[in-house]
Amino acid sequence: MNSFPWLTIFVVLPISGGSLIFLFPHRGNKVIKWYTIFICIFELLLMTYAFSYYFQLDDPLIQLTEDYKWIQFFDFYWRLGIDGFSLGPILLTGFITTLATLAARPITRDSRLFHFLMLAMYSGQIGLFSSQDLLLFFIMWELELIPVYLLLSMWGGKKRLYSATKFILYTAGGSVFLLMGALGIALYGSNEPRFHFETSANQSYPVALEIFFYIGFLIAFAVKSPIIPLHTWLPDTHGEAHYSTCMLLAGILLKMGAYGLVRINMELLPHAHSIFSPWLIIVGVMQIIYAASTSPGQRNLKKRIAYSSVSHMGFIIIGICSISDMGLNGAILQIISHGFIGAALFFLAGTGYDRIRRVYLDEMGGMATSMPKIFTTFSILSLASLALPGMSGFFAELIVFFGIITGQKYLLMSKILITFVMAVGMILTPIYLLSMLRQMFYGYKLFNAPNSYFFDSGPRELFVSISILLPVIGIGFYPDFVFSLSVDRVEAILSNYFYR
């Protein structure tokens, strides 16, 4: 066990530092914002230092472990630890949260609460990615939902209460299945609950019971990922949310579902996962085609980007269910890649809204001449989203392809059919993304000039855009940076996959 509680500090620091915000004057908006940014940057630098000096990349085991008895009566432990799989999402969380806080224009209404909720969400996400205990995982899952609901319901569009209510109903419903699965695994074969991931991973279950547990966890993670048909909350939520909240939703929140699929469904329930994988691959392929076909019909800019997120999550599902080293590494790379690209697209959509006060694509047009910097960055990141070579999304989708082709689980004809349909989905992606660019930036201005503000990106917006664009290009040219974190852990997950 690690002698210094690094992970506990990373979990507690944002929410405890955020609690001090309520001591600030109510009208000190800039002070509150820069204080929040300071906490985010300090946390990110501290994580980078700790992981650089104390994390061994070639060790597939759980590192920086902490194991403290928290509640004596319930025999509940505070168990934290990270491996190569969780390291990437944790660093992504720190990076995107920092930029989302910087990206937000000054919030004039309840500024203290807004920034506190951003930091509380930060703590919940770090806690979830570093949890090594099923009950702690569930607590962090729920802790993260409360700030998201409040951010959605208090700041956003006219239908924000509807979208927030839809979000909480879907996610709370999924959480019931998550809790049932966690309690079922913990209480199986014992009168005392055993929530430790390591203990659960070494436990064998009757096939029918393992399938029952798997379905419960799958429903919870399918809502959050999202997986069709449990995705309908996502377009409404993104369509109404403040763009800083959208950055956190697209960049981090959706990745929690994919993380849970690997950490719990794949690691703890391998036999059930091998049974469900072919069916989930079919769902993933359908999701790519469905979302790519539905996206062009969306008038709302943020809803169109939201459907592109649903489509890209299909590649993650396929990579996870390929049950191959290459496929799972590709899924992890797609998690990181889409975290950057999705957050950036929603940020740029928000900057455009700040200027023209329009969200419907058929009311836009001709923005390229008056806002060339926004046009350039939006175009580059849209090309990254459609997997242009040299961008992170290209290698992520390509390696998922190779993972399916080289995997040993599926027959040749099945592989050919899956890759063909995936290729069709990739062909549809440029259609809705390039159409979106055409409607926004080309042609004549369709909106009223007196109500619009034709100034281009300022230093803050350029900094945020470039900060996200650099890792997208960097990973596109050197994907081994991400693979060096995950490859050993992926081998450990798959090493004895069918022999437990």
UniProtKB/Swiss-Prot annotation:
Enzyme class (EC, first level): translocase
EC number: 7.1.1.-
Subcellular location: Plastid, Chloroplast thylakoid membrane
Main location: plastid
Keywords: Chloroplast, Membrane, NAD, NADP, Plastid, Plastoquinone, Quinone, Thylakoid, Translocase, Transmembrane, Transmembrane helix
GO biological process per UniProt: ATP synthesis coupled electron transport
Residue intervals passing through the bilayer: 4-24, 31-51, 84-104, 111-129, 134-154, 167-187, 208-228, 242-262, 272-292, 305-325, 330-350, 386-406, 416-436, 463-483
GO MF assignments: NADH dehydrogenase (ubiquinone) activity; quinone binding
Catalytic activity entry: a plastoquinone + NADH + (n+1) H(+)(in) = a plastoquinol + NAD(+) + n H(+)(out); a plastoquinone + NADPH + (n+1) H(+)(in) = a plastoquinol + NADP(+) + n H(+)(out)
Superkingdom: Eukaryota
InterPro entries on file: NADH_Q_OxRdtase_chain4, NADH_Q_OxRdtase_chainM/4, NADH_UbQ_OxRdtase, ND/Mrp_TM
Cellular-component GO terms for this entry: chloroplast thylakoid membrane
Family, per entry: Belongs to the complex I subunit 4 family.
Protein name, as recorded: NAD(P)H-quinone oxidoreductase chain 4, chloroplastic
Organism in which the protein naturally occurs: Manihot esculenta (Cassava)
Gene coding for it: ndhD
